[in-house]
Structure formats: C-alpha cells, structure tokens
Regions:
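Rhodanese-like catalytic fold shared by cysteine-dependent sulfurtransferases
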Residues: 1-11, 20-59, 68-109
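Structural scaffold elements adjacent to functional motifs in cytosolic proteins
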Residues: 13-15
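Short, surface-exposed ligand- or partner-binding patches at beta-edge/loop junctions that are enriched
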Residues: 63
Length: 109
C-alpha cells in the first residue's frame, strides 16, 4: 500500500533518521528528511520553521532505521492534527523489498 501511495505522489514520505544515517545509506526515493528532533518544528503550520511539504489533508508516511522513531513521529503528527499517518517501519526492509532509494552524494562532489 505504501509503495502505491508513494508512486502515485499522494503522500509525503518523511525520513526521521538522523543526518549521518541518511548520508550513509540514502533515503526512500522522493522522501523529505526531517530528523525526529525537528519534526514538531517542521510539521506545525504555526511554526516559523514549517516545511510547506506538510499538509494536514495529505497522507504522511514516516520511517526510520528500525521503526521505533517513526512510531513516535507518527504519534506526534497525529497529536498535531494529521489524520492519515502511516508507519513504513524500517528503511532496511524497504530496501530489501526493492523500494527505490536516492543514494547519497559522494563526499567532495
């Protein structure tokens, strides 16, 4: 279901891992990187740091390395008023199931 939503472009996909994790392994193709510690600032429309990719009427799919941080992120988003929130779970599971990945840029490029 997540792959279909992502392919259709209906959902925003959010990687809540820390920057070094994303730099090392890449991220789900088309995902927005917002570390778990910054999520409230980026997802709250009243925040001066709001990321305009977040819309409360748009489905949000969150993931992390193992599924723990993304579960917490999902709860946070629901507390902020997002109604369609999905936990994709672990990034490694996405990769192992053939999901698309945007690879990191080589250092120095």
């Amino acid at each position: 279901q997540a792959q279909a939503m992502i392919a259709a472009g209906h959902a925003i996909v959010v990687d809540v891992r820390d920057a070094p994790e994303v730099e090392k392994s890449g991220k789900v193709s088309g995902a927005v990187h917002v570390s778990r510690g910054m999520l409230e600032f980026r997802a709250d429309p009243d925040s001066p740091y709001h990321d305009k990719s977040f819309h409360k009427d748009r489905p949000v799919i969150v993931y992390c390395a193992s599924g723990g941080r993304s579960a917490l992120a999902g709860k946070t988003l629901k507390d902020l008023g997002y109604t369609e929130v999905y936990n994709l779970g672990a990034f490694k599971d996405w990769v192992e199931n053939g999901g698309g990945v945007d690879r990191p840029i080589e250092p120095g490029m």
